[in-house]
Amino acid sequence: MKNLCLVLVAITATSLTLNAQNAASDAEAKAAAEATVRSFVDSWNRADGASYGENYWPDAELVNPSGEIVDGRAAIAQEHVDLWAGIFKGSRMAAKVRKVQRLDPNHIIVDFDTELSNVRELPPGNQNQGKNVLRTHLKHVLEKRNGQWKVLSAQNTFIAGK
């Protein structure tokens, strides 16, 4: 009976430890997601290509709302520099995290919505969502390397007008 009690105590202690670790992991995932989205918004609103690109790993991939695949941090940053020189010059971004899902200790999925205001021209494939406004859903897979969270893969999709 004494051995059974010791086993039950050990199982309970292990369970409590795992629950505490999961809670800490979930908090870390949420903090990483929020920090990444804040960095995207800040760098967008400054039209800062280098800072924007730093959110991505060098081997990252982005699928833009038009379905084009952009490979690598440098190409992703340059695509945004080009956008800020064109139809998104002077635009302002606001964003809200909708969902954070931890896949494993080093990978999370972040779903968030953006709204761009002061858009000069709506891109092809986008429905009118109001005067000079563009809304998108983004899904980013963040990967943790050497203690840093950055985007490994991203999908950006226009929100259909209502």
Map each language-model feature to its residues.
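Bacterial N-terminal signal peptides
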Residues: 5-15
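Sec/Tat signal peptide C-region and signal peptidase I cleavage site
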Residues: 16-20
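A beta-strand edge to alpha-helix "cap/lid" segment located at domain peripheries
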Residues: 21-48, 54, 61-162
